[in-house]
Amino acid sequence: MTFGRVALLVGVAVLVLVANVAASILYMVVYSYVIDPGHDPQYYNDHIQAAAPYCSIVAGIPLMFGAGFWVAGWWRRALGVRAAWIVWLAYVLIDLAVLLVAGMSMAVALLFGVSFGTKLAAAHFGARLRLARPAEPAAAATSAQL
């Protein structure tokens, strides 16, 4: 795998990370305006600290599944699942670096371990689903005629 390909996959990991953070922000907006309005900002800051790992798990599974599905079709079949794993690995390294700098408790570390595991499974199964599907119906019809 070339450096350019890995750079593209790291870019996908960053997109997934940004989308996951956006999902947490959206959750917090809905929570603060609809579910439990009327508190001071510190209340909501404390709440998102507790809720963020769960948001990461819930939103991260479909995001990473989609990323795995997407990148598995970029190059030949042999690189499909490997590309999804590289996206996951880049995501984990970036997210883990941020968490270590921010300082996390053991409970949060356990939840993020679960989050990383579910994301790996999602990326893997997304790539496997993409590879299990026929490439293009027109190509299959052409090869059947030969």
Show where each model-derived region lies.
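Juxtamembrane/disordered regions of integral membrane proteins
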Residues: 1-146
